[in-house]
Amino acid sequence: VNESVYRIILSRYPQIHLFERVSNPQDWDVLYAVESLTNPRLRDEVGDIRLVPPEDRVYGDGASWIMAAFTHPPVDGRGGRFNRDFGIYYCAADEAVAIAESSYHRARFLRESRIDKTTQEMRVIRAQLGPTTLHDVRHLLEDAIYDLDHYGEAQQLGYALRDAKSFGVHYQSVRAQGECYGVMRARALSDAIHWRYLRYHYDQGAIVNVESLDGSGRR
C-alpha cells in the first residue's frame, strides 16, 4: 500500500501541539515533564503515550493527527471493528468511503444517546499511508469479521495482528462500495494535514445530509 488516505474525526478534537513541537524522539520525555508542570490537562490531550512503542512514534508537523488515534483508545466498551482497548487509525483511500463509515458511526452514537436532531462538525484528515504491507482480508467477505454490527471475531483478528506487530489490515467497507484500512502502527503514516470541514446533519436516527463548509478550503 502506498497512497493518500482520508480519516474523519469530530472537529472539536484539537491538534496536540506537543507532538508537533518534538523533532527528536529523545526530547519527548523531557518536554512532556516540563509541559505537565504548567498544563494539568496535558495527559487528557496527549493520551496514553505508553500504548505506542517508542520505535513507532511519529513527531513533527501533522504528527498529532496520527498519534491521537493510537494514544486515545476506544472508551465505549464496544470498540472498533478490529480493536477494543487499543488504538487503530481507520481510514480510506476514497474520501466518500470515509464519509460513509464515519456517518454510520456518528448516527449510531447519536441514536444511542437518544438525540432526535442535531448537527456535528467534522474534520477531514488526509495523510500518506505507506509504502507498507498490510494484512489483506478483502477476499473474506463471507467471514464473521465482516458482520455488520458485531465485532467479536474481527477484534480477535485485530489482537492477533497487533501481537504479531502487523502494520494493519486492508479490508472491504461494509458501509459503502470501497476499501478501508485499519493501521496499527503510527510510523506507517506520514504527512497528515487538515483537509476540510464537513457538517453532518442528523435527523431521526440517520445522517441525512453531509455539508462541505464554505471557506474550509483544502490545505
Regions picked out by a protein language model, each given a short descriptive name:
Residues 1-82, 93, 107-219:
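Active-site and NAD+-binding cores of ADP-ribose-processing enzymes
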